[in-house]
Design a protein with these regions (language model features):
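Outer-membrane beta-barrel transmembrane strands
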Residues: 51, 117-137, 144
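Residues on the lipid-exposed face of transmembrane beta-strands in outer-membrane beta-barrel proteins
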Residues: 66-72, 86-88, 127-133, 148-152, ...
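Extracellular/periplasm-exposed beta-strand and loop segments of Gram-negative cell-envelope proteins
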Residues: 52-59, 93-103, 108-122, 155-183
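Short loop/turn motifs that connect adjacent beta-strands in outer-membrane beta-barrel proteins
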Residues: 25-37, 73-80, 136-144
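Surface-exposed strand-loop-strand hairpins of Gram-negative outer-membrane beta-barrel proteins
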Residues: 46-67, 173-176, 205-207
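Transmembrane beta-strands of outer-membrane beta-barrel pores
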Residues: 43-49, 86-94, 133-135, 150-158, ...
Length: 229
């Protein structure tokens, strides 16, 4: 038993000595393996391109988008990185393009008479991937950044509403909309404020026509992007 207590005493002394020799961890020191800008939220305005003759946007056509991007640095100083993730976008388009109630792709028209509302709302799930440059350091979250990439968007919901001339139309699930959208974007700025532009590379409609001509409108969005963490 005496040998047991002797061994136990030696073990305790050794353990206490090892603990005293352990280096202290400074939780306030900068993290050299940091990641940046993994959550984002943005607000932009749609300016439709390649619109049919007579098309006009009414009021403001806003976009709200948000999501998560995994930041994957590719150099030692972590100023270059690849970002990839998942997002969601809601776009509201106020315009004078009349969308047929029965989904007939040949019945689209430019509205001539007065109306109170003519609005198309679309929701997209988005997969962005981008290359990132930033003048960041472990000590500061205030820096210049330039991010550019491609975004793949999948239509998950759409709703069209018209109100005017004693007529009200509400329609969901328009089959003429192209479910798959893709485009290029750029985000650049300092600290909190970042300019954002997006250019759609394919039309939002896949089979709609006006007077026998295909509607090849695509989106050009300009706005602001904010990054968190």
């Amino acid at each position: 038993m005496r040998h047991f207590y002797s061994i136990l005493t030696l073990l305790l002394v050794g353990l206490l000595s090892a603990q005293n020799n352990e280096p202290e961890i400074d939780f306030d020191s900068p993290d050299s393996l940091y990641r940046e800008d993994q959550f984002y939220i943005g607000l932009s305005y749609s300016n439709m391109q390649n619109a049919p003759s007579g098309f006009d946007q009414l009021k403001i056509s806003p976009n709200v988008f948000f999501g998560f991007l995994r930041d994957m640095p590719i150099n030692k100083s972590r100023t270059w990185a690849i970002g990839a993730g998942l997002g969601y976008r809601i776009s509201v388009m106020n315009h004078n393009l009349g969308i047929p109630e029965n989904g007939n792709s040949d019945s689209y028209t430019i509205l001539q008479s007065a109306f109170d509302k003519n609005r198309l709302t679309v929701h997209y799930a988005e997969l962005p991937i981008e290359i990132r440059w930033r003048a960041s350091t472990p000590e500061s979250h205030r820096f210049w950044r330039i991010y550019t990439g491609l975004k793949l968007s999948y239509l998950v919901y759409n709703h069209y509403s018209f109100d005017g001339s004693g007529l009200t139309i509400k329609q969901k699930g328009n089959p003429d909309l192209d479910k798959l959208q893709y485009g290029a974007y750029l985000s650049a700025g300092w600290n909190t404020w970042n300019a954002y532009i997006y250019y759609g590379l394919n039309p939002i409609f896949k089979s709609a026509t006006i007077e026998g001509k295909e509607i090849k409108m695509n989106t050009f969005n300009i706005g602001l992007m904010f990054y968190i963490l």
